[in-house]
From Swiss-Prot:
SUPFAM superfamilies: GroES-like (SSF50129)
Identification of the protein by name: 10 kDa chaperonin 1, chloroplastic
Chief place where the protein resides: plastid
Transit peptide (residue range): 1-61
Amino acid sequence: MASSFITVPKPFLSFPIKTNAPTLPQQTLLGIRRNSFRINAVSTKWEPAKVVPQADRVLVRLEVLPEKSSGGVLLPKSAVKFERYLTGEVVSVGSEVGEVEPGKKVLFSDMSAYEVDFGTEDAKHCFCKESDLLAIVQ
């Protein structure tokens, strides 16, 4: 899990400065100093099964295809990515979804899907509308 460091400035603070100038009497002048503090923001991992889509949205776990074909030919990344985005397993559904249930395998268009990163290393997920699903695979 990677952490990010950002610096956020505090408001200006006044503090006394002593001077040793011979022409000025020993007095305290106000100086202005700018402080800052550091915030350590750590990204959290989400359990995909606990994420509930809203309305007619569906959460789909993208199917990962092997990088080699059955004949041993290495497939280019663009071909693997294109095919992978067309199939997946439904993880959870919104309250207005009618026919689709969790556990079903679906085909969908990658143009209407919104990919999200839950911090899990094993799979990628995306949200799409129920109307954007092309088919349910039996």
